[in-house]
Structures are given as C-alpha cells and as structure tokens.
From Swiss-Prot:
Cytoplasmic topological domain residue ranges: 1-4, 61-74, 149-165, 306-363
One annotated GO molecular function: taste receptor activity
This protein's UniProt keywords: Cell membrane, Membrane, Receptor, Transducer, Transmembrane, Transmembrane helix
Membrane-topology annotation of the record: Multi-pass membrane protein
The protein's name in its UniProt record: Putative gustatory receptor 36b
Keyword Chaperone assigned: no
Entry superkingdom: Eukaryota
Keyword Transmembrane applies: yes
Role noted for this protein: Probable gustatory receptor which mediates acceptance or avoidance behavior, depending on its substrates.
Subcellular localization(s) per the UniProt record: Cell membrane
Residue intervals on the Extracellular side: 26-39, 96-127, 187-284, 385-391
Family listed: Belongs to the insect chemoreceptor superfamily. Gustatory receptor (GR) family. Gr22e subfamily.
Amino acid sequence: MVDWVVLLLKAVHIYCYLIGLSNFEFDCRTGRVFKSRRCTIYAFMANIFILITIIYNFTAHGDTNLLFQSANKLHEYVIIIMSGLKIVAGLITVLNRWLQRGQMMQLVKDVIRLYMINPQLKSMIRWGILLKAFISFAIELLQVTLSVDALDRQGTAEMMGLLVKLCVSFIMNLAISQHFLVILLIRAQYRIMNAKLRMVIEESRRLSFLQLRNGAFMTRCCYLSDQLEDIGEVQSQLQSMVGQLDEVFGMQGLMAYSEYYLSIVGTSYMSYSIYKYGPHNLKLSAKTSIIVCILITLFYLDALVNCNNMLRVLDHHKDFLGLLEERTVFASSLDIRLEESFESLQLQLARNPLKINVMGMFPITRGSTAAMCASVIVNSIFLIQFDMEFF
C-alpha cells in the first residue's frame, strides 16, 4: 500500500532542493546528514539567480502594482511594503541557511533520530501534514493563478519582479512548513511522553498504597525509576530541539511574524478598498476578486494553524507538569531511587522551563497572540481611517 505521507514529504524534500532552500542532503533510512558538492553548487547557483533577479527588478523600476489596474497612492504604498517585506524575508531566509548550515544539519539529524526511535509518530502527525500541505499548496497555486491572470499587462521588468516575488514566497512558505513539521513532531512526542508519564504516575500511586513492601515492590520501583529517567531524557531532548529551532529559525521567525502582521493589516485594508471602490472601479475582474478572497482566507487560516501548532506544544508541556504534580497525592513515600527520580525530573523542569520565543524577544503564548491580534485590528482600522480622510 502506498504511504501518501512519505510520498508527500519526499515531494517537499525535492521541492526544497529545486528552489535552492536546502544546501545539504540527508538519508532518512540511516539518519545520515551530509554535505555534497552537487547540492551545494546547485543551491548556491539558485540563490545567486534569485539575487540577480531582485537587483534587476529594483533597477528596472517596473510597475509594482500587478493586482489593481487602477489604484491610488496608498494602495501602491501598501503593496510596495508588503512585497518588499516578502522579498527581504526570502533573502534573509536564504542567507540564514548558509550562515547556520551546521546548526540546521544538526537539527535535521535530531529530527530524523526522533522519527526513527518512534515510528508511530508518522500516524500521529499525518493529518497535520495533510492540512499544512493543502493550505501551502493552495496558497502557492492561487498566487501563480493571479500572476498568470496579470500576464497580459506585464512588461519585462514586471515579469522579472513577478518571478522574484513568487520565488521568495515559495521559499518562505517552505521554511515555515519545515518549522511547522518539526513542531508537529515535538507535539506528537509530547503526547507519547505524557501517556508514558501517566502510566508511571498511576503505577506509583498504586504502589504507594501497598503495606507489604517486599522484593517485588523494590523491583517495580526500580523499573518505574528507569522509566522516569528515560522520560526526563526525552523531555530534555525535546526542549533542546525547541532551543535549536529558536536559534536556526529565529530570524526567519521574526520575518515571518512581521510578514504575517503587515500582510494581515494590508489585506484587511485591501478588502475594505474593494468594498469601498468596487471591483469595477479598481478594474478588478470577478475571477480575480474571487481568487483574492480565497487567498486571503487561506492566508489567515495558515497563520492560525502555525500559531496553534506552537501553542499546543505549550499545552502538552503544561499537561506534563500537571501530571508530575499528582505525585503529592501519593499515600506514602516510595523507594528512595524512585523518589529521587521524581525530584530530579521536577528540578530539571524548574531549572529550565519550556519557552517558545521569536529571536528571544517575543514569547509565543496565548496572551501575546491575543495582544498581536488586537494590534492588527487597531492598525487595520487606523489605515482604513487614513484612507477615508485623505483619499
């Protein structure tokens, strides 16, 4: 039977090579991560080509507005800012892959090792992969459709600019998808780890009620202590991977959040403009209007899915801490080794609490996400009011 998850991941893997995002190779069967001359040269040439087209686009002074055939200055400024940020984000992503090539290779090695140790992870993350793949593919397909729809009014400069925007958009989408996949694996591993910890807690609670503490009791406590130490080691590895993600994807994460922020504000304003002026006055066809509406919806959904993925990791970690707190309701003390294992794990978590940050500056929490959404709404309203007053 064909495993569509494996085929999908292989397709994304090849896509990363073709677009120049991956500058090293790996073998999932052996866990080997290595550099190759072929991959390095191809990625370097692809990145140079993107850089040359960007330079040409900025020196050619082509039309930056390929969506609205009739637009005011504010529309053009918003489109320039959104497009410029997307290009900068793509360039920083590419540059970061070269500067942190070694760290990225180590992260991939850890991810493959985690996947090989727990083959059941594949069945746990398949629907998350499918959802993310569908959204990403739909966004890129609609972007290409919009670009093809505008071909009849483009010159050479506009064509090159369009190619640049598509390339950097694909690069950013792939980089965000890679981050999503790693977080998804960490989420699944946390679920497995929580299930194991729950079994240890339940067994320890049962043992705490036993009055007769013979050799079998001691043996069972030693077994549970080993299980608890294994859980603590896995939790430490997961937390290390989260730290590696922040280090490797930190700058990309900052650019992605900035892109999400400004793009949501910009698309909110563009939606208002279409409502205010009407598609006809903006010379926007019905087909383009429908595509834009679907694209905006998918863009919002993509931001929601990415953010929820990280928040769920924090939820699983909170459940992990809650399970450990149940140790206080045990009827009596257990074997000294098991007690020390519990204390060691709690000390490990207290000394190094799990945090997900963007460049170590912006914490990813429900509170910070709500504050960001409120800021997006306020700035969208401000931009709309500015349009109402001056245009």
